[in-house]
Amino acid sequence: MTKKKAVRKHIKLTSHPGGDGATPIPIHWGASDPGERGPVVGTLTDSAKRNVIGTHSGSYAVYRALAVAAGVLDPQHTADLTNTSPWHSFGPHPQWFDAEKIVSIDPFGAVVNDVFRDYYKDGYDIRPSIAVTKAHLNMPELHTAIEEGRLKPDGDLLRDNGECCVTKISFEPVWYLPGVAQRFEVEESKLRHILFEQTGGMFPELVTRVDLNVFLPPIGGMTAYLFGDPGMVHQPETKLTVRVHDECNGSDVFGSDICTCRPYLVHGIEECVRGAQAGGSGVIVYFRKEGRALGEVTKFLVYNARKRQKGGDRAEEYFARTECIAGVQDMRFQRLMPDALHWLGITRIDRFVSMSSMKYDAIVRYGIEIKERVRIPDELVPEDAKVEIDAKLAAGYYTEGEVPDSEELSKAKGRKFKA
């Protein structure tokens, strides 16, 4: 018996408004009623029902395509969302309904199977873009903090075995294009054209489908870790400790000592635990922006250039080496970062565990008050990371101490490569 070949559908390289006779459900971003706002339909099971550009899972959408191509995933599979609801319900908060406060995540992304239940009955395949669960963190630095007496187990948040109990929230990026354009102070049409061109023409609908105002970009999202009662995070009387952290795989995971990323991340976690144990709450938001969003290959090229340059690895050339290779010092653009804090309902941060002027300025600019800024203790800065910390202090990062002068910046402090 011969196996019947699947018949491929005609491929449309692009689409146009009304081209297939279907009228997508409009998305009225910022509407307080989910029915009026409308669902984000980014699935591929029925293309006529889609009302966004792009698809779910961020950068992992490509792996989904590979799974379909390999024959291990049915392209018509729909998710069974039984027992997947958030273990803790967040919001709705006033920021959810302000089209200028949240532009890069779907406020209703965690509860789509509740608030859009009627659409499921009509055959719409709607996927969550936010998931909320519980987790235990087990990090050697927390064990050390307990041994040295900086933290004390309480049997609830921090256990005797060193495990820390947290609420964990994963966000996929969902961009409201008019709002993103406003954040970057460009015309929406210009943003659409440049996104299309600079991704190699990956999403022609950015140009042809001006009726679709939501884009699911193929990039990483972020994860929030909440310490203490998650229901207290948004309350005005709660003393809140926050660290916003951008991914650094080499340091965060493997302990590379050329930067302060893991030490500062762990310091932030310790401060969050301490704050929550004192009756407040703590929040760590971890963004996938490897190498200042320049990527890890670029980052490693910069490391090589720094170590091999004439005069050695020194702070005065720290940013210049990045700019020579990447054409820019930093592409993280913290303007979208406050959205996760707004989703949590945060209006004030009592202790902001960061020295970054970019992060501080973005949070304050978009309506969140910061009472106190907390720098990384000197003893936590690795020897090879002193180049980084000096360069950042000279560039305007927060400190209560002295800013390195030109003579100090010219000293080679970075480790030399051995032949």
PLM-predicted stretches and their roles:
Residues 1-419:
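Catalytic domains of riboflavin
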